């Protein structure tokens, strides 16, 4: 039971008239009137009792004279709903200070204006007007003061603004303001960051400034921007400190929900995490933004929304904010292999498309098509998969034709350009092109390595995936030749890595004895482009000490080391059943083999595989030349200098067992993808499939071994030591770990999972 605490003291109301109260009186006027116990939560620094906080009413101690207006406050609230503009006086504002914050329990009592949704992309929305809505309520004075004191000094802020190079535009405006308005009025420059909020303003507005400053710092580097070398603390330290404080006190504080600015703060947090490489944290923040937006009703395009605006100068469009939230969510879901948060597709209605710009229309169509790809990946049956894929492909073609052919030329980025606005929009166009080609890769990747009795059946998907990968990589080189700051345009690094891997695997798959290689003439130019991408990633790591760039460059370097040869040698992509993972995440492998540890997935083994005589015999009999094959096996962990092997007891034959009599006891695991246990094995010799997944019902093993999750590997071995099982789990990063602990963030897992999609999910 919480001990009662005195209601707001006389310090809170320095000019108020005090009255004498009986000894032991602690309750406020509102609790006394309601005959309720007045309790303060000791865990919360607040001048309001629990009851007043829940009701959203002023909490005034009985030692102060009660104003009759407070008693009738509830009735006045109801009347204000019907008023076109509520009447507010300075005394009213002071007494109603606690109402400036919407909490889930005070929705009914807050005097909102209910607003019809906009049918024009340029319309501004305003809610209940308040002369001092941006002023901090009394219960948040300490928080506002604390946040203000955490801001960098004005001298540091001025240096940060002067350090702007090609990042001289505040991109966070894209989250709230439509393109046509930004084209017409221009984007804000860093000088707007010099408008530092006063210590008495609402804490959400101070946090918004902190997050804007942090996201701007992401695009700067001390070695490239000399002005920030003399800051009172390192730019990265300032950036991290500002974000940590804003997240801890504002974006995760349910008491501060309800305003457009608070939603914008959560959106900026999600964008910040994505740029820093923390895709999983970005996804979590994005889902929080989606939930808040739904509570506000922003998803209800043809209905009513409810929210408030703290600062009348805030520019925003609620439907655009909803579009940005949903787009980022679907983009991250594709990268991470996660289900989408909502299936809303109203953003591509005829009305929305007609009111937007060319690039805005493309992005709206991309948002809807991402939803369809995610839906296909999640629910499509064997018969539907190919049909849905073809439909989405045609829609992407239609979306591309909505812009002129000249628009699709890769823009030439030049920091020397005097017009920074033009440079910004050229970069934005380049990114939109990359995202378009990434959708093509995501759409056709499951078919890229498949073969069929009809050899040309999947050629379209393979060639589309190859060409889209080239388009992504060429634009990535253009971007990173100019912008080598790791925290700028971060998601493009993940997309480029997937494109490079897809292109390399496509070339590997084409090097088969006796088969015509349709990519032979492009191999050297493609290889040179991937080498340039690898060099760019290496340089970014040298400049930024960036884990993602370092590991991506290392992986591509190893893949490039695999020689592409014809003859009787084929290239295999499988997962090593006995791979040994050291503490640094590398594996011990023979020459010519690349092994990648994928957390929660296994060890991917990529290398040349020379078939045995028996293998060649089976291959010739069943299907001709074997293409790439993929297996997935669990990871074994080495926590000390001695290797520890995981051996899985096989109760069904692996591809090696089928093709070679010299290894009759090759271990084989059971896997669980989408909660369906099956064995993934290379059976390239079988007709109509390069990857065959043999389903096995291992009920006994399922009872004895818990799955790590819906998409995680399950080891099928009753002798698997529980201590080693625990060690294996302990060595995985946390599910929402940052990029320093989990560089690839699970993007590699989603990539290989897409390639290894089972026949039950793919059309034949």
UniProtKB/Swiss-Prot annotation:
Disulfide bridge partners, by residue number: none
Keyword presence, Ribonucleoprotein: no
InterPro entries: Transcription_factor_dom_fun, Zn2-C6_fun-type_DNA-bd_sf, Zn2Cys6_DnaBD
Entry keyword annotation includes Zinc: yes
Role description: Transcription factor involved in regulation of the dehydrocurvularin biosynthesis gene cluster.
Compositional bias annotation for Polar residues: 77-88, 663-672
Biological process (GO), any one: DNA-templated transcription
Organism: Alternaria cinerariae
Localization in the cell: Nucleus
Keywords, alphabetical: DNA-binding, Metal-binding, Nucleus, Transcription, Transcription regulation, Zinc
Predominant location: nucleus
Record-given protein name: Dehydrocurvularin biosynthesis regulator
GO molecular function: DNA binding; DNA-binding transcription factor activity, RNA polymerase II-specific; zinc ion binding
Alphabetical list of SUPFAM superfamilies matching this protein: Zn2/Cys6 DNA-binding domain (SSF57701)
Superkingdom to which the source organism belongs: Eukaryota
Region called Disordered, residue ranges: 73-94, 112-136, 633-672
DNA bind region: 28-59
GO CC terms in record: nucleus
Name of encoding gene: Dhc4
């Amino acid at each position: 039971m919480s001990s009662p605490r005195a209601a707001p003291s006389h310090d809170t109301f320095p000019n108020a008239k005090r009255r004498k109260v009986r000894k032991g009186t602690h309750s406020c006027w509102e609790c006394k009137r309601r005959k309720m116990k007045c309790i303060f939560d000791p865990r919360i620094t607040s001048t309001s009792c629990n009851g007043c906080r829940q009701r959203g009413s002023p909490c005034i101690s009985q030692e102060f004279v009660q104003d009759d207006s407070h008693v009738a406050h509830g009735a006045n609230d109801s009347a204000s709903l019907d008023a076109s503009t509520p009447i507010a006086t300075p005394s009213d504002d002071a007494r109603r200070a606690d109402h400036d914050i919407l909490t889930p329990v005070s929705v009914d009592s807050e005097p909102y204006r209910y607003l019809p949704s906009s049918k024009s992309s340029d319309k501004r929305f305003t809610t209940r007007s308040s002369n001092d809505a941006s002023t901090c309520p009394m219960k948040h004075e300490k928080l506002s003061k604390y946040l203000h004191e955490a801001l960098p000094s004005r001298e540091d802020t001025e240096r940060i603004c002067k350090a702007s190079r090609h990042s001289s535009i505040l991109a966070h405006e894209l989250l709230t303001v439509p393109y046509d308005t930004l084209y017409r009025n221009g984007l804000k420059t860093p000088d707007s960051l010099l408008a530092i909020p006063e210590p008495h303003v609402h804490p959400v507005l101070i946090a918004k400034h902190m997050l804007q400053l942090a996201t701007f710092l992401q695009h700067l580097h001390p070695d490239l921007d000399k002005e920030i070398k003399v800051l009172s603390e390192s730019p990265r330290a300032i950036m991290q400190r500002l974000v940590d404080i804003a997240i801890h006190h504002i974006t995760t504080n349910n008491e501060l929900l309800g305003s457009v600015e608070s939603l914008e703060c959560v959106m900026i947090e999600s964008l910040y995490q994505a740029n820093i490489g923390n895709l999983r944290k970005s996804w979590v923040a994005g889902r929080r933004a989606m939930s808040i937006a739904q509570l506000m009703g922003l998803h209800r395009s043809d209905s009513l929304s409810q929210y408030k605006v703290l600062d009348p100068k805030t520019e925003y469009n609620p439907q655009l904010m909803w579009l940005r939230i949903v787009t980022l969510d679907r983009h991250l879901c594709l990268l991470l292999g996660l289900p989408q948060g909502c299936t809303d597709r109203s953003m591509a209605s005829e009305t929305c498309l007609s009111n937007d710009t060319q690039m805005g229309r493309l992005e709206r169509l991309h948002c809807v098509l991402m939803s369809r790809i995610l839906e296909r990946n999640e629910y499509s049956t064997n018969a539907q998969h190919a049909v849905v894929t073809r439909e989405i492909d045609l829609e992407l073609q239609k979306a591309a034709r909505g812009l002129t052919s000249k628009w699709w030329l890769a823009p030439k980025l030049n920091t020397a350009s005097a017009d920074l606005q033009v440079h910004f929009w050229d970069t934005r166009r380049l990114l939109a092109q990359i995202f378009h080609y990434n959708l093509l890769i995501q759409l056709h990747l499951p078919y890229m390595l498949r073969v069929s009795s009809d050899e040309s059946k999947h050629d379209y998907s393979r060639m589309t995936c190859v060409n889209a990968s080239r388009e992504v990589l060429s634009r990535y080189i253009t971007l990173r030749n100019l912008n080598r700051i790791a925290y700028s345009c971060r998601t493009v690094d993940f997309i480029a890595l997937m494109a490079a891997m897809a292109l390399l695997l496509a070339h590997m798959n084409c090097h088969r004895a006796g088969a015509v290689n349709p990519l032979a003439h492009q191999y050297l130019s493609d290889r040179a482009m991937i080498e340039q991408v690898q060099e760019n990633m290496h340089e970014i790591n040298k400049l930024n000490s960036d884990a993602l760039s370092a590991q991506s460059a290392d992986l591509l370097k190893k893949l490039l080391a695999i020689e592409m040869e014809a003859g009787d040698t084929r290239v295999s992509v499988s997962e090593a059943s006995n791979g040994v993972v050291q503490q640094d995440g590398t594996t011990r492998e023979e020459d010519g083999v690349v092994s990648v540890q994928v957390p929660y997935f296994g060890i991917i083994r990529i290398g040349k595989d020379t078939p045995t005589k028996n293998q060649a015999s089976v291959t010739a009999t069943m299907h001709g030349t074997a293409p790439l094959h993929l297996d997935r096996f669990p990871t074994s962990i080495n926590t000390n200098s001695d290797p520890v092997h995981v051996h899985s007891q096989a109760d069904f034959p692996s591809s090696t067992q089928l093709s070679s009599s010299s290894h009759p006891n090759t271990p084989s695991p059971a896997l669980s993808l989408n909660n369906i246990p099956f064995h993934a094995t290379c059976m390239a010799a079988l007709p109509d499939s390069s990857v065959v997944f043999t389903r096995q019902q291992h009920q006994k093993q399922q009872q004895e071994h818990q799955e790590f999750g819906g998409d995680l590997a399950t080891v099928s071995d009753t002798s698997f030591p529980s201590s080693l099982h625990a060690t294996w789990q302990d060595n995985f990063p946390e599910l929402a770990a940052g990029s320093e602990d989990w560089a690839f963030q699970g993007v590699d897992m989603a990539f290989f999972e897409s390639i290894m999609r089972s026949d039950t999910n793919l059309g034949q």
